[in-house]
Amino acid sequence: MLSPIRTTFHNSVNIVQSSPCQTVSFAGKEYELKVIDEKTPILFQWFEPNPERYKKDEVPIVNTKQHPYLDNVTNAARIESDRMIGIFVDGDFSVNQKTAFSKLERDFENVMIIYREDVDFSMYDRKLSDIYHDIICEQRLRTEDKRDEYLLNLLEKELREISKAQDSLISMYAKKRNHAWFDFFRNLALLKAGEIFRCTYNTKNHGISFGEGGIYLDMDMILTGKLGTIYAPDGISMHVDRRNDSVNIENSAIIVNRSNHPALLEGLSFMHSKVDAHPYYDGLGKGVKKYFNFTPLHNYNHFCDFIEFNHPNIIMNTSQYTCSSW
């Protein structure tokens, strides 16, 4: 058994390759280190709120000296030539910009553009009205001294304002143009995992197996070599930000060994049960913590050690040294 408090663990690829059947423990339970193999596809994401800021025939992904995001993706495609590299995109792109995306696919045999509107996420949707109804009913069932009348009246007012055309959690997030838009659909893409590559008519997807896992990387992650075979506790792991003597789970790099990973489904259940749920804090953080039985009694640093995805061939989170490209 591996200790959850470690400096190496599964982020040291050579160590786990020598003992692929090892387990790691957290909160008194052991979890198998499951395989994310060398054929598992890599997914990047670029949701562009202002496509008009690019030149007419330019790929609408930031690519400056300070933020060379497109270069980072094409560099990954060259290094990981045996993996499919997906770019999950959304935005009000022009015909010329979509043509530029198509040219990028032609230039790189293993690169695939995946448009958000082409992917069926309906199995993860819920009516906003149902979310409101559940919370309103819960408030009404409380005794008068514990009922929040102000909240109840506010929820009932907001419920009346939801039209049939707007009665969808997914549709609500699809209209946003902020980080919540980005984060929400990242979570759904990771629920699909490798299957998201089969949601396009592109013939490049024929090598992707149904239900296969996926490796998600933000575009500020720089590959310096092949990732090889990776192992993660129960098949899920993610980047941990370590700055200013604090640690935090980050959604900038996440690996899963299968679609519909139960830790991510736990996060989706939070998104389905709160009117003010946040896709990062609730949809990822709370879901993963709940799945692995993390409680306030546990040491958060130990949990971060347990869940951390780190790799010697990835320079993580380089945009922390610059201003946001958004």
UniProtKB/Swiss-Prot annotation:
EC identifiers of the protein: 2.4.1.-
Residue numbers binding UDP-N-acetyl-alpha-D-glucosamine: Q45, W46, F47, Y69, Y216, L217, D218, M219, S319, S324, S325, W326
Where Mn(2+) is bound, by residue?
A: D220, N317, S319
- Which is a Gene Ontology cellular component entry for this protein? host cell
Q: What is its main location?
A: secreted
Q: What class of enzyme is it?
A: transferase
- Which chemical reaction does it catalyze? L-arginyl-[protein] + UDP-N-acetyl-alpha-D-glucosamine = N(omega)-(N-acetyl-beta-D-glucosaminyl)-L-arginyl-[protein] + UDP + H(+)
Tell me where in or outside the cell this protein is found: Secreted; Host cell
Pfam families named in the record: SseK_NleB
Gene3D superfamilies xref list: 3.90.550.20
The cofactor named in the record is:
Mn(2+)
Q: Where is this motif: DXD motif?
A: 218-220
Which key words are in the record? Glycosyltransferase, Manganese, Metal-binding, Secreted, Toxin, Transferase, Virulence
Function of the molecule: Protein-arginine N-acetylglucosaminyltransferase effector that catalyzes the transfer of a single N-acetylglucosamine (GlcNAc) to a conserved arginine residue of host target proteins. In contrast to NleB1, not able to disrupt TNF signaling in infected cells. Shows a lower enzymatic activity than NleB1.
Task: Name the chain's protein.
Answer: Protein-arginine N-acetylglucosaminyltransferase NleB2
Which species is this UniProt entry from?
A: Escherichia coli O145:H28 (strain RM12581)
> Which gene underlies this protein?
nleB2
